[in-house]
A protein has these predicted regions:
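Gly/Thr-rich phosphate-binding beta-strand-loop-beta motif of the actin/hexokinase/Hsp70
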Residues: 1-25, 116, 122-145, 161, ...
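Active-site nucleophile and cofactor-binding loops and adjacent substrate-binding regions
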Residues: 102-109, 237-241
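Short beta-strand-loop/turn "lid" adjacent to the catalytic site in phosphate-handling enzymes
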Residues: 52-105, 142-147, 153-154, 183-193, ...
Length: 253
């Protein structure tokens, strides 16, 4: 079994890969104020609750975009499973052309592009991740990292709106009934959901124009399923694509 840990800005996502199937997933709120001992108690209890047999875990792999927590989580995984975790970095084998990987490329985006290229080798691939940040990561047919576009995530944009406008209500993001909102909640949904769907399609179109080829477009992340119905150019939706990228790294290393 392989335990995969994806440390993101909002959540820490953990899942177990067993016989090619992902199971026993859970999420823990990312909190840099928690001590290592607190995280140890949380992770230990959640693994035990889900019946994860610690002695049957062969590998632990970790991706992190939160440097402050990386060492703490790594230490706790080593303590729980008695294994040295594989840490996602530019130096480990990933199936991409390492010479083309930008020094600042985040571990999560590296996982996304590695899996996108592995999954679809017939041409260039763009992986769109609807997370805290909205990211567009593109890799060539040959496995070259072509580049990334980044925008504020949908929830990030909504939170910014609330932070500067006291009278607006909290809104659950879902597909609006109309682009012409008749109350505050529907107006925000219309602006965010319809606006972001247009942003996504524009970046896809401009990237294809710049490269001179059609992209295979994959979407992942928390809100990908919600907004996907508004975007015509998505070829595939995979909510656990980043975890699959972690699994690929585990297989290659």
């Amino acid at each position: 079994m392989t335990v995969a840990v994806d440390i993101g800005n909002t959540n820490i996502v953990v899942a177990v890969l067993n016989n090619g199937e992902w199971n026993k997933p859970f999420r823990v709120f990312t909190d840099t104020k928690k001590t290592g001992d607190e995280y140890y108690v949380i992770f230990s209890s959640l693994f035990d609750e889900r019946g994860v047999e610690r002695d049957k875990v062969d590998k632990v792999i970790i991706s992190s975009v939160v440097p402050f927590l990386t060492r703490s989580i790594e230490k706790n995984m080593r303590r729980i499973f008695k294994k040295d975790p594989i840490m996602i970095s530019h130096s480990v084998e990933c199936g991409l052309n390492k010479a083309t990987i930008p020094p600042e490329l985040g571990a999560d985006l590296l996982c996304n592009m590695a899996y996108g290229h592995y999954h679809h080798k017939d041409g260039a691939v763009m992986v769109i991740d609807f997370g805290t940040a909205l990211t567009f990561s593109t890799v060539s047919k040959e496995g070259d990292v072509l580049g990334v576009a980044i925008a504020p995530g949908l929830v990030t944009a909504v939170n910014a709106l609330f932070g500067s406008t006291a009278q607006l209500p909290q809104v659950e993001l879902k597909v609006p009934s109309s682009v012409l909102g008749r109350d505050s909640m529907e107006s925000i949904r219309a602006g965010i959901m319809e606006g972001y769907s247009g942003l996504v399609e524009k970046i896809i179109a401009n990237t294809e124009k710049e490269l001179g080829e059609r992209l295979y477009v994959m979407a992942t992340g928390g809100l990908s399923s919600t907004i996907s119905t508004l975007i015509d150019r998505l070829d595939e939706l995979d909510p656990i694509l980043t975890l699959k990228g972690l699994g690929l790294f585990a297989d290659l290393n």
